């Protein structure tokens, strides 16, 4: 190929002129704009319900707390109801109670204490007092009263923490005294803790116990303690939690199932669930007298077992404050106490324990 001639590039030069022009500029004055404050929602801190019915029955129910409860809450609750009938001698009743409560919110933990006093009085009913002589049934033999003094301290976390831990617990004490000389002291406690892993898995355990000491006329001391380990999985709209509830009741060991399964079909509005829960229910005067206050002094107190089997259920909440819960299942009781008239005094009841 022929050799091409290479020419040197032509030299080029440029002349750039620079000119500066000063222009005065005054920005518009910045004025702060205030957004209109929204009126805070008024929250009631005083509640009072009062009424009056036939048989000279006054009803009072009240509650009062401090107005700003963001950091702490202190309050007082009370209730009272009684009846007074002229034509039915000694067949009236009275129920009253007052509770002082307080709780304090730390950064992520809430602690609180309740102190209460209850006085309930019941007169025997269901008989015609005109058929019996006054010497047999007088005012002192036709009523029974219950006085309860108790307190409860509790704690729980109400905010998320770096370790994804949830925990809560309580310790309670109740002293019950009857006007026939019987008394009962109850101590109960529970502690629950759980941890979440990878926003899917949950593992935890709960320990709880109850100690009942009854003087009637001898001494009857009973202690129940339970331990419940559990684990769960949560994936989208489905959640399942299962474990075992192991209970020691006066030296006897019982193992119950613990299973909760739910499917959130429509968030908060339609939830399908089924459950299988078992436990030992404490049977004492404190838990029984509100169902039947006429309890014999000759009762042999014993606890009973329960199993709540919910085969299928639907629950949810609808706008407007309406909620529903419909389920199909069965309750299974073992050693269930049934009230039976005492043969020595028809005004009192003892127990017949049904095996199943």
Language-model-detected regions and their locations in the chain:
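Outer-membrane beta-barrel translocator/receptor signature
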Residues: 29-30, 39-48, 52-98
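Residues that define the transmembrane beta-barrel architecture of outer-membrane proteins
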Residues: 42-44, 56-58, 92-96, 143-151, ...
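Exposed, low-structure sequence patches enriched in small/polar residues
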Residues: 43, 48-51, 239, 243-256, ...
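Transmembrane beta-barrel strands of outer-membrane/channel proteins
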Residues: 48-52, 78-80, 113-121, 169-175, ...
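Residues on the lipid-exposed face of transmembrane beta-strands in outer-membrane beta-barrel proteins
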Residues: 62-66, 76, 100-104, 151-157, ...
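Repeated loop/turn-to-beta-strand initiation elements of outer-membrane beta-barrel proteins
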Residues: 71-74, 108-113, 160-167, 197-205, ...
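Flexible loop and strand-edge segments within Gram-negative outer membrane beta-barrel domains
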Residues: 84-99, 114-164, 172-184
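Outer-membrane beta-barrel translocator domains and adjoining extracellular loop/strand segments
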Residues: 88-91, 123-132, 178-186, 214-222, ...
């Amino acid at each position: 190929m022929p050799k091409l001639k290479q020419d040197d590039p032509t030299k080029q030069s440029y002349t750039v002129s620079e000119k500066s022009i000063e222009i005065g500029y005054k920005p518009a004055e910045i004025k702060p704009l205030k957004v209109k404050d929204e009126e805070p929602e008024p929250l009631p801190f005083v509640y009072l319900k009062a009424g009056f019915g036939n048989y000279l029955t006054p009803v009072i129910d009240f509650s009062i707390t401090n107005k700003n409860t963001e950091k702490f809450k202190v309050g007082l609750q009370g209730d009272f109801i009684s009846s007074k009938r002229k034509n039915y001698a000694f067949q009236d009743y009275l129920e009253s109670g007052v509770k002082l409560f307080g709780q304090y919110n730390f950064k992520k933990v809430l602690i609180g204490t309740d102190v209460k006093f209850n006085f309930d009085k019941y007169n025997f009913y269901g008989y015609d007092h005109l058929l019996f002589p006054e010497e047999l049934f007088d005012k002192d033999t036709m009523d029974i009263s219950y006085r309860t003094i108790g307190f409860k301290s509790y704690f729980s976390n109400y905010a998320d923490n770096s370790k994804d831990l949830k925990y809560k617990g309580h310790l309670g004490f109740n002293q019950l005294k009857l006007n026939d000389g019987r008394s009962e002291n109850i101590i109960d406690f529970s502690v629950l803790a759980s941890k979440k892993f990878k926003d899917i898995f949950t593992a935890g355990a709960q320990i709880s116990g109850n100690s009942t000491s009854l003087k009637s006329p001898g001494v009857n001391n009973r202690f129940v303690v339970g331990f419940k380990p559990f684990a769960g999985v949560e994936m989208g709209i489905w959640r399942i939690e299962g474990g075992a509830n192991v209970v020691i009741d006066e030296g006897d060991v019982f193992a119950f199932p613990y299973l909760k399964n739910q499917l959130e079909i429509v968030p908060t509005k339609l939830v399908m669930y089924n459950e299988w829960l078992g436990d030992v229910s404490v049977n004492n005067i404190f838990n029984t007298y509100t169902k039947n206050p006429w309890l014999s002094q000759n009762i042999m107190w014993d606890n009973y077992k329960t199993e709540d089997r919910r085969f299928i259920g639907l629950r949810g909440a609808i706008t407007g404050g309406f909620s529903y819960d419909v389920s199909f299942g069965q309750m299974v009781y073992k050693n269930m106490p049934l009230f039976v008239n005492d043969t020595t005094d028809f005004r009192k009841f003892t127990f017949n324990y049904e095996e199943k």
